[in-house]
Amino acid sequence: MAQDISFNVRSNNGDPLRVGAWRFEGDGSGPKVHLQAGVHADEIAGMLVLHLLMQRLQVAEAEGRLKSQVTVVPQANPLGIGQFRQGRLLGRFHDATGHNFNRGFDQSAAMNPPSTNIQEWQKSLVQLASSADVMLDLHTDDEALPYLYVHRSFWPRGRELAAAMKMDVAIIWDDGGDGSFENAVQDFHGVRVDRFSGRRSRGYPDCRNRFVTSFPARHAGRPIVRDRETGVP
């Protein structure tokens, strides 16, 4: 049975807002996994995916098939989910300050104590994910090919994840300093040194493969690029 590890953050007027979080223990033989969605609170698809996944995880745990400890935060941003204007959900930016909800996580995580409710919320999310071996932060685009956004240090191992998720494109990023959630978690684990060259990965002069790798491109339903390592089109 999932353990409720939810926590509260302060709203703009100081009232408590709940961040729902649950943990499935598994048998401990697999890696620790952290899954979350809704940092940008108007990006709905990931929230739905994780709510449905929790049902499957509950069944798998009950049947003794779950190997990993899995933490799920299906709607990570109670501050943004309540922001409406003329009937439209505005969940990308904090209405009171204009702050992008997925920026500044690195600064917030370093504060002791955080100064604002946004910083408290961001630091709490980073701390919750800090012990994970695998972390996926789900976002939704308006209109785009399915893509995986992955740090260079996890490539080419990330091809297996891209194949499993049936992605068309993998966007490979270096340390950019934008303070996004994934950037802050990377920093927490010290993934600053490029694992292939043994040097810091800020500002590669050779950026031929820095931004986009086709995986796998499709045209008229037929794969153009095939993953030779996994054999998955």
Where are these regions (language model features)?
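Structured catalytic-domain cores with a bias toward divalent-metal coordination
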Residues: 1-233
